Amino acid sequence: MKVHLDRTSSGFCIGVQGTIHLAEEKLEELDSKLYCLGDIVHNEVEVKRLEDLGLITIDNEEYNKLKHAHVLVRAHGEPPSTYKRADSNELSITDSTCPVVSKLQRTARLLFELGFQIIIYGKKTHPEVIGINGQCADQAVIIKHADLSVPEETDPIDFTRQTALISQTTMDVPGFYILKKNLESLFADRTDAAEQKSTHSWKTIRDIDITAEMTGICPLPDLVYKDTICRQVSSRNAKLHDFAAANDIIIFVAGKKSSNGQVLFNICRESNPRSYFIADQTGLQDEWFYDNGRPVGSVGVCGATSTPMWLLENVAHSIEQTYAG
């Protein structure tokens, strides 16, 4: 049995790497406690490792009561209200918001200030989406289902307003464009036939287009979209698909809360039905590794952007020691 560890399309993305590195630095240099608002990463094993080093995870209620303390803002980012509370409670903020998320927040804020209705492709309760929505005074329309199958998600849309479609950075690219197409049809259905072609043709925009609108040089169309999905994350999809197909079985390692983990695991399972989701090596099951009593030929170990490489290495080592010996 050969055990293959995916080192090219698994493990922390740059944003999470920066957050973990900053947390470790602060834990080493601070004499006082370091708090983190929410799980620093959606991986229970990594959270426990950092908590063992002294990191204290708190929720919003605890954060609002905290005073004169050091707080880490994780890669997902936070809404403006979090920073206002920090000022009023004299909190010292270490901001590790992912640069890709920071750019997205700025885009959402500028479009909202220009009067656009903001539609976010994402999950309403995901911390990144909460942060983006905060840039829009919590008035964004949030749609998780690209097929528009949930009326409660589309009911808040005002079809008379200028509208901008953006996305949570970790959503799937095909889903974003399916949503765009379905929204085009929905907007067309809600308007007069005479207006459909001219007013309700969706146009992609760049940062320079937003600047041009702000300065009055070139007004934006009524309906615009900006693909804000992180390509470092989405580019892993094809690589993981091929990796999964090249092995007899796949052991996918991720936290239960990881949105990206669910997306990537589904990609693995579509490519290889013998794909199994675990949090760590304790989740391994003997029957996965045998065909008619004989060991399988190859095992692929991979994971999410929130899965640390050290954990993937531990899982691969455990498989080698237990099943490949």
From Swiss-Prot:
CDD domains: lytB_ispH (cd13944)
Alphabetized UniProt keyword annotations: 4Fe-4S, Iron, Iron-sulfur, Isoprene biosynthesis, Metal-binding, Oxidoreductase
Record bears the keyword ATP-binding: no
Domain of life: Bacteria
Cofactor: [4Fe-4S] cluster
Co-factor binding details: Binds 1 [4Fe-4S] cluster per subunit.
Pathways per UniProt: Isoprenoid biosynthesis; dimethylallyl diphosphate biosynthesis; dimethylallyl diphosphate from (2E)-4-hydroxy-3-methylbutenyl diphosphate: step 1/1; Isoprenoid biosynthesis; isopentenyl diphosphate biosynthesis via DXP pathway; isopentenyl diphosphate from 1-deoxy-D-xylulose 5-phosphate: step 6/6
Binding site for [4Fe-4S] cluster: C13, C98, C230
Enzymatic reactions: isopentenyl diphosphate + 2 oxidized [2Fe-2S]-[ferredoxin] + H2O = (2E)-4-hydroxy-3-methylbut-2-enyl diphosphate + 2 reduced [2Fe-2S]-[ferredoxin] + 2 H(+); dimethylallyl diphosphate + 2 oxidized [2Fe-2S]-[ferredoxin] + H2O = (2E)-4-hydroxy-3-methylbut-2-enyl diphosphate + 2 reduced [2Fe-2S]-[ferredoxin] + 2 H(+)
Family annotation (InterPro entries): LytB/IspH (IPR003451)
GO MF annotations, alphabetized: 4 iron, 4 sulfur cluster binding; 4-hydroxy-3-methylbut-2-enyl diphosphate reductase activity; metal ion binding
Protein's GO biological process: dimethylallyl diphosphate biosynthetic process; isopentenyl diphosphate biosynthetic process, methylerythritol 4-phosphate pathway; terpenoid biosynthetic process
This enzyme's EC code(s): 1.17.7.4
Amino-acid positions noted as binding (2E)-4-hydroxy-3-methylbut-2-enyl diphosphate in the UniProt annotation, renumbered to this chain: H42, H76, H126, T169, S258, S259, N260, S306
Residues at which dimethylallyl diphosphate binds: H42, H76, H126, S258, S259, N260, S306
Amino-acid positions noted as binding isopentenyl diphosphate in the UniProt annotation, renumbered to this chain: H42, H76, H126, S258, S259, N260, S306
Disulfide feature: none
Residues annotated as the enzyme's active site: E128 (proton donor)
Record's function text: Catalyzes the conversion of 1-hydroxy-2-methyl-2-(E)-butenyl 4-diphosphate (HMBPP) into a mixture of isopentenyl diphosphate (IPP) and dimethylallyl diphosphate (DMAPP). Acts in the terminal step of the DOXP/MEP pathway for isoprenoid precursor biosynthesis.
Family recorded in the similarity comment: Belongs to the IspH family.
Protein name: 4-hydroxy-3-methylbut-2-enyl diphosphate reductase
